[in-house]
A protein has these predicted regions:
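Trp/Phe/Arg-rich N-terminal binding region typifying the photolyase-homology
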Residues: 1-79
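Alpha-amylase-like alpha-glycosidases and glucanotransferases acting on alpha-linked glucans and related
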Residues: 9, 15, 53-187, 216-441, ...
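Short alpha-helical segments and helix-capping/turn motifs at coil-helix boundaries
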Residues: 24-31, 127-128, 192-200, 274-276, ...
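Conserved catalytic-core segments centered on acid/base and nucleophilic motifs
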Residues: 29-44, 197-200, 204-206, 274-291
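Domain-scale activation on soluble regions of proteins
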Residues: 35, 161, 468, 479, ...
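Conserved, well-ordered alpha-helix/loop/beta-strand core segments that scaffold catalytic motifs
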Residues: 183, 187-216
C-alpha cells in the first residue's frame, strides 16, 4: 500500500510553553495530516534527554520526556493554575527551543502539579506502576539519586549505590520515596497524555512512526540498573564504546561513547531485554524505525578512554538470531531499518533476510562521480523514501549549498532547469512522492520551503541542534490544498 507522511518531532510543535508537547497543537497537527491526505506522522525518540538535548541520548530507553507533558491538561485537573503556567519564563523566540530556560522552569511546575495531585491513591496509577515494574522503579530511583548527587553521572556516585549493593538500594528507596513517586507520576502522566494523542491519530487514520536508537546512553538508568547487559568491567566502566570508523568525511571517525551490548548475555537470556524494549515501543508507536541497523550485523568497538575512533575495530552482532526471536515471540512487526551510510554485503543480506524496508534519502542521490543507489529508478517497492531526515539540511538549504556538479546532476534528474529557485524543493518532494517506494515521508520544513535556519541537527556538533520549532499557522489553506493534491496525484 502506497502511503505518505510527514516528519515532525514532538518538541518542534508550536506551544505557548517553550517546547512542543501533547497539547492541543498536537491534535491540530493530526488534523492537518488528515486534511492533506497523509497517513503517517514520524517523530523522533520520546525519551528524557540529557546534556546536548539529543533525543538519541536519553536517561532511559523506556521513559518519556517530561517536557512533553501538557501543562494545560494539568491545569484542567486542578493541579496547576493557568497563571502559574503562563508566568514561567520559556524564552522569547517561538521558532526555537531555549532548553536552559525550559529546564529551569518546567520541573518546578511539574513538581507543583504532583504535590497538588492525589495520584498515589489513583488505581490507574497503581496499575501503571505494576505493569512497568521491569523498568519504572529503577528509573525513578536513578533520577532521584541523580538529583541528590547534583546531576553527576552514576559512575561518580558512592560505591555502594553505584554498584547497587542491596542494602544501599533499599536505604535510598525509603530515603527518596517522595522523589521516586514524583518521577513515577511524571511517567504515568506522560503515558496517559501520549496514549490520548495516539488514539486521536488513529481516529483520523494516522499511524505514528516512532524511532528507536540502537544504543543507550552510558549515563542512564538502563546501564546503572542492568550492567550485565553491557560490555563493562568489574567497576562497571565500559570495555569499549560505540562509534564509526574514519572515512572520507572524518579522518578520525565518530566517537559516540555509548556502552556496547554484551550480546552473549542477551543470547543466553533469549534476548529478554530486547523483547521487552521492542514490545514497549509498539505500545507507544504503530511503526518503529530502528536506528543504525547495521550495528546488528557488525558494530564498531572503540577502546574506552580514547579521544577518537581511530583505534576501533569491528565485532559481530547478533544478526538474524535476534530478529528471528523477535518474530517468534512478538509476531510480524512494522519495522523500518535505518540502513544509511557505508554498508557491507552482510548488512544487505541481513536487511533482505529480515524483510524490513530500508531507507532512501534523495539528498544523497546526486553525486556526478557515481551511479547512486539513492536514485529513484533503483528503488524496490519495499523501502521508505525521504527528501532528507533530521540529520540532513532542509531541502531548500541543501540546494543552496550544493556544488555546481552535484546541482547539475540533481536538476537534470528532476528536469528542473527552468523551475524557479524558490520552488525547487517541490521538485524533490514530487520526485520522492512519485517514486515506486511504498512509503514516502517528507520533513515538515520541506513542505514549508524553509532554509538551513530550520535544520534540526548537524551530526557531530553541539550547540544549536534540536531547537527548531514550527510556528503556529505555518500551513496556509493554499499550501494544505497543494499537498493534498500532490498526495492524491501520486496515489498515496
Amino acid at each position: 500500500m502506497r502511503r505518505n507522511g510527514m516528519l515532525l518531532p514532538i518538541a518542534s510543535l508550536p506551544s505557548p510553553y517553550g517546547i512542543g508537547g501533547f497539547s492541543k497543537e498536537a491534535y491540530e497537527f493530526i488534523d492537518l495530516l488528515e486534511e492533506t491526505g497523509q497517513k503517517l506522522w514520524q517523530i523522533l525518540p520520546l525519551g528524557p534527554t540529557i546534556y546536548g538535548d539529543s533525543p538519541y541520548q536519553s536517561f532511559s530507553t523506556f521513559a518519556g520526556n517530561p517536557y512533553f507533558i501538557d501543562l494545560d491538561t494539568l491545569a484542567e485537573k486542578g493541579w496547576l493554575t493557568k497563571e502559574a503556567c503562563e508566568a514561567s519564563d520559556y524564552g522569547d523566540n517561538e521558532s526555537y527551543i531555549d532548553y536552559g530556560r525550559i529546564y529551569n522552569s518546567r520541573f518546578v511546575l511539574l513538581k507543583q502539579a504532583f504535590l497538588n495531585s492525589d495520584i498515589l491513591s489513583d488505581e490507574k496509577f497503581t496499575e501503571f506502576c505494576k505493569a512497568n515494574q521491569h523498568w519504572l522503579p529503577d528509573y525513578a530511583l536513578y533520577m532521584a539519586l541523580k538529583n541528590q548527587n547534583d546531576g553527576k553521572s552514576w559512575i561518580e556516585w558512592e560505591e555502594e549505590i553505584r554498584l547497587r549493593k542491596p542494602e544501599a538500594v533499599e536505604y535510598y528507596k525509603k530515603e527518596l520515596e517522595e522523589e521516586c513517586n514524583f518521577y513515577e507520576f511524571l511517567q504515568y502522566e506522560f503515558h496517559e497524555q501520549w496514549t490520548k494523542v495516539k488514539e486521536y491519530a488513529h481516529e483520523k487514520g494516522i499511524q505514528i512512526v516512532g524511532d528507536v536508537p540502537i544504543y543507550v546512553a552510558f549515563d542512564s538508568a538502563d546501564t546503572w540498573a542492568n550492567p550485565e547487559l553491557f560490555q563493562l568491567d568489574e567497576k562497571n566502566l565500559p570495555l569499549g564504546v560505540a562509534g564509526c570508523p574514519p572515512d572520507a568525511f572524518s579522518a578520525t571517525g565518530q566517537l559516540w561513547g555509548n556502552p556496547l551490548y554484551n550480546w552473549a548475555y542477551h543470547k543466553k537470556t533469549g534476548y529478554d531485554w530486547w523483547l521487552k524494549r521492542i514490545a514497549y515501543c509498539f505500545d507507544l508507536y504503530d511503526i518503529v524505525r530502528i536506528d543504525h541497523f547495521r550495528g546488528f550485523d557488525e558494530y564498531y568497538s572503540i577502546p574506552y578512554g580514547d579521544e577518537t575512533a581511530v583505534n576501533g575495530h569491528w565485532e559481530k552482532g547478533p544478526g538474524m538470531d535476534l530478529f528471528n526471536t523477535v518474530k517468534e515471540k512478538l509476531g510480524e512487526l512494522d519495522i523500518i531499518a535505518e540502513d544509511l551510510g557505508f554498508l557491507t554485503e552482510s548488512v544487505f543480506q541481513l536487511l533482505k533476510d529480515s524483510g524490513y524496508p530500508g531507507m532512501k534519502v534523495l539528498q544523497f542521490a546526486f553525486d556526478p562521480s557515481e551511479d547512486s543507489d539513492y536514485l529513484t529508478y533503483k528503488y524496490q517497492r519495499n523501502c521508505v523514501v525521504y527528501t532528507g531526515t533530521h540529520d540532513n539540511d532542509t531541502t531548500a538549504g541543501w540546494f543552496e549549498k550544493l556544488s555546481d556538479g552535484d546541482k547539475e546532476v540533481a536538476l537534470r534528474y528532476m528536469n528542473s532547469f527552468y523551475t524557479p529557485k524558490e520552488e525547487q524543493h517541490w521538485d524533490l518532494i514530487a520526485l520522492a512522492m512519485r517514486s515506486t517506494a511504498d512509503t514516502c515521508i517528507i520533513p515538515v520544513q520541506d513542505f514549508l520551503g524553509l532554509g538551513s535556519e530550520a535544520r534540526i541537527n548537524m551530526p557531530s556538533t553541539l550547540g544549536d541542534n534540536w531547537k527548531w520549532r514550527m510556528t503556529k499557522g505555518a500551513f496556509s489553506e493554499e499550501l494544505k490544498e497543494k499537498i493534498r493534491r500532490m498526495t492524491k496525484l501520486y496515489g498515496r
